[in-house]
């Protein structure tokens, strides 16, 4: 299923935090204040974020996907995230929940394959789910979850992504 802003945010720990946060934010909306709730995908950038943690493994020829690799991975390039925040500030008609993720979600195996291609390295060593959970505890489930999320409301309001696909985003991050 494709998750848009009007869908339920889920039932895991992070979903619970998001629901509570959004409920509190809506109190301001009830008083006439414009509220734009930002739901972030995984941010891709050179100086931090998911790729900064993955690139060293790929450079050492031990890169691969997480878990089965079939999970959908909602992501956004840092430049697009910043542009989307500016877009919301400049467009007073935009409010409510907004998915801050690229319009073309990728599966983890596609992310790993593309990162390997861009770096000129193989992508053959997946990190098993049990190792991710062991290393990251409950937060590991966040990386193993599958969310095919799209930024439906940003797109309907006319926002344009500089990096709409995973390959262009990874190429930009590696070139930074």
What are these regions (language model features)?
Residues 91-138, 171-176:
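Mid/C-terminal beta-alpha module of Rossmann-like enzyme folds, strongest
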Residues 1-37:
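Catalytic helix-loop patch of NAD(P)-dependent Rossmann-fold dehydrogenases
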Residues 8-14, 41-48, 68-78, 89:
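Glycine-rich "substrate-gating" loop/helix at the edge of Rossmann-like oxidoreductase active sites
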Residues 141-176:
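C-terminal amphipathic/interface module of NAD(P)-dependent oxidoreductases
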Residues 26, 55-64, 71-105:
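Alpha-helical substrate-binding/gating segment
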Residues 53-75, 117-146:
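Alpha-helical membrane-targeting segments
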Residues 18-19, 31-33, 44-53, 88-98:
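Glycine/proline-rich active-site loop of Rossmann-fold NAD(P)-dependent oxidoreductases
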Residues 81, 85, 100, 111, ...:
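Non-catalytic, hydrophobic alpha-helical segments
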